[in-house]
């Protein structure tokens, strides 16, 4: 046997055991399902413990506020579709920002619970009652639900949304816009057509942190996307 082979074999075996041990050590809590305004919320059980009772109550109240503002402006059939999209609420996750998880592969590659696939995720409950979050992103939950709706109901390959995105890029109308702070910046919607749809949804149904801030401004500034919004969400009067 080659004298170099045994040390190499030992390294391979040790590495295999380490990787197996690492995978075995990945343990995730089993969430508790709660109903908030008709949505299924997969709740970190720590939020329901007595030590976190006050925080949990405040967060559920804030989340209900977010969902009510969606529920009362949309047609009932749209609300029913959105209520099929689950939300995961964690006490303190190593992820920071609220987000939507479209793919299991990314979750597993980054050592997150694969059960978060196709969920809107609120990694840190305190974000729901944070003053800065309310000042900057008063419709952040709607934004993430819009991603879920885009993926699961419309499809990320929706041609009308992609066409509107390409149109606005070609016109350069989002290159320098007003931010909620008063500064002029490049619009976050330019990131990709998915963010464009979610940002436009915020403006159409609520208030966005980038111009166009409101439905009327979206209609004036980006009429093609405004028409997409009317088609997707229905007229708002």
Where in the sequence are the language-model features?
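A domain-start/cap signature at the N-terminus of enzymes
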Residues: 28-29, 33
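Acidic/His-rich structured neighborhood in mature extracellular/periplasmic domains
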Residues: 57-170, 213, 225-226
């Amino acid at each position: 046997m080659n004298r170099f082979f045994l040390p190499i074999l030992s390294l391979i075996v040790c590495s295999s055991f380490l990787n197996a041990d690492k995978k075995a050590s990945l343990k995730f809590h089993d969430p508790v399902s709660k109903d908030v305004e008709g949505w299924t919320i997969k709740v970190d059980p720590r939020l329901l413990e007595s030590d976190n009772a006050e925080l949990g109550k405040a967060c559920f109240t804030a989340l209900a506020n977010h969902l009510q503002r969606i529920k009362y402006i949309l047609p009932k059939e749209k609300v029913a579709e959105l209520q099929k999209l689950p939300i995961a609420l964690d006490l303190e996750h190593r992820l920071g920002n609220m987000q939507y998880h479209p793919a299991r592969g990314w979750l597993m590659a980054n050592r997150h619970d694969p059960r978060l696939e196709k969920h809107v995720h609120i990694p840190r409950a305190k974000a729901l009652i944070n003053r800065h979050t309310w000042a900057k992103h008063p419709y952040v939950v709607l934004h993430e639900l819009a991603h879920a709706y885009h993926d699961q109901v419309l499809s990320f390959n929706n041609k009308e949304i992609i066409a509107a995105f390409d149109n606005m890029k070609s016109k350069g109308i989002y290159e320098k816009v007003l931010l909620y702070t008063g500064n002029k910046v490049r619009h976050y919607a330019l990131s990709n057509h998915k963010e464009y749809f979610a940002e436009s949804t915020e403006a159409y149904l609520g208030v966005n942190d980038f111009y166009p801030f409101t439905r009327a401004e979206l209609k004036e500034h980006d009429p093609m996307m405004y028409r997409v919004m009317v088609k997707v969400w229905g007229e708002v009067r």
